[in-house]
Amino acid sequence: MKYLISTFQRILKILLPNDLKEFPKFSKKDIKRFQTWDNQLGWCNLPNNVKLDRSDRKFQYQKNPTGIAVISTDEKGSRKCSYPSEKSEISFYGDSYCMCRDVQDNETIPWYLGEMRGTRVSNYGVGNYGLDQALLRLIRDYQYERSEIVILSVVSITISRCCSVYRHYLEPGNFFAIKPRFKITENKNEIKLIRYPFQNKEEITNLKKFKNFFRSNDEHYQLWKKNKLNYYFHILPRKILKKFGISLTQNSTETLKYDLSFWQKQEVLFLEMMSQFQSFAEKNNFKPIFLLQHQKKSLEYLKNKSPNELEWTAVIDKPKKRFPKITFLDEAEIFNKYDNIDELYLRSHHSPKANLMISEFINKNL
């Protein structure tokens, strides 16, 4: 009987996995494990914290594990950096590529840059952030560590993240990545902030209560509905065939193209965020820099195209002219002619070698 029940449960998980549920149930125990919860940004790195990088946890049970990355933060919430006691000359805000996952604390872009310049370069990158969250964190937390230069550093899919409030719609299974976002008003004359919806973390146990908020403020709800059907017509048959040793190739560029399409759909949103960045820089007297970074799939994608064919080129060209005080950098300038792309990545993020190259590139442009 127990065998039949467990078999039925396994079949049910295949036919109706959590990823297909719009609002699965979570216990208070599940919520308690969400230690990085933040009541304004959705989530944020904890200060004075040491953790094993998530992508490396599968290696921790090996007898002689190698390459395990440890992420340490200081009392201010920055990832550990060289010259920690010095006044910060430069501070980074951004996503996991800014934080530099998959490498040690002393192999990150800010660490290398700090060594080159003999100064503290703080690192406030947070995994899975969009440009909007990075900007909001800068505006909220800059007062606690002022610097002469601020670098907003995000990957090329960042605008699709900016159009999300419930990341599960964009990345099925990412249920706790609930966030604020900026939205352009209907007359396109101003930007408004859609605030994080929860007052306390326990409200996540009742996601369905916020159904209307999620569906009306997230641009990816229709994508999630489409993916739900796609699971039964494409993904499930592939899973069944794989059980019989038959693997079918998948078109991995479709997801990337979807994400990149938001550059042109949300051009005004990007311009308004850059306007806020420049205004905040002027108010606080720091030099603003925007750095575009690339996941491996993004770098492979752009290598086969001219700059004019890339979704972000024309969009970024406009604020270059409108906001001359912002320096715009793209790491593709140093990587697009690099022959061995594999050398630039470890698992899902940049390798120490790539991080060193990026820090040298930034240093030359300061």
Language-model-derived ranges and their functions:
Residues 92, 152, 290-292:
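Structural beta-sheet core signal
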Residues 99-186, 193:
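Conserved SGNH/GDSL esterase-like catalytic core that processes O-acyl groups on lipids
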